[in-house]
UniProtKB/Swiss-Prot annotation:
Name of the gene this protein is made from: rnhA
SUPFAM superfamilies: Ribonuclease H-like
Subunit structure: Monomer.
GO terms under cellular component: cytoplasm
Cofactor note: Binds 1 Mg(2+) ion per subunit. May bind a second metal ion at a regulatory site, or after substrate binding.
Pfam families, per database record: RNase_H
Known function: Endonuclease that specifically degrades the RNA of RNA-DNA hybrids.
Entry's EC annotation: 3.1.26.4
Name of this chain's protein: Ribonuclease H
Enzyme class: hydrolase
Length: 153
């Protein structure tokens, strides 16, 4: 099984507002960068989408070390999602899970791979996190912004 390192970040100019995600995938001596901007979205949606798109870009099952600066993503996938799924995608206080469209997609992608999650403090000088931040911010301020079809706000 191939071992891939993935680094992700999301950015939003306004929250909600124009947003983007960035991801860097490393395999042996190869690297691949992914990014996309959206017209109107949130930071959390971009953090989720970065991980989804990075995992979805893998064409076979892989062992993945995924590093994010989002506690929301890391805690959601490691702690909260099992109960959300069990409770019909509702939180412990019976409210609908926010960003459920993306959580379902992430759940599906994580199921395809052996993922180990890592957290790094954002803007702390971690080279790959900083690169993802640049990709995400550049995408958010770019000209080819897409609609975020799942955004409700």
């Amino acid at each position: 099984m191939k071992h891939i390192e993935i680094y992700t970040d999301g950015s939003c100019l306004g929250n909600p507002g124009p947003g983007g995600y960035g991801a860097v995938l490393l395999f042996n001596q190869h690297s691949k960068e992914l990014s996309q901007g959206f017209v109107h979205t949130t930071n959390n949606r971009m953090e989720l989408l970065a991980t989804i798109e990075a995992l979805a870009s893998l064409t076979e099952t892989c062992k993945v070390d995924l590093t994010t600066d989002s506690q929301y993503v890391k805690n959601g996938i490691n702690q909260w999602i099992k109960n959300w799924r069990k409770n019909g995608w509702r939180t412990s206080d019976k409210k609908p899970v926010k960003n459920v469209d993306l959580w379902k997609r992430l759940d599906e992608q994580v199921g395809r791979h052996d993922v180990k999650w890592h957290w790094v403090k954002g803007h702390s000088g971690h080279p790959m996190n900083e690169r993802c931040d640049v990709l995400a911010r550049d995408a958010a301020s770019g000209k080819s912004l897409l609609p975020d079809e799942g955004f409700q706000g």
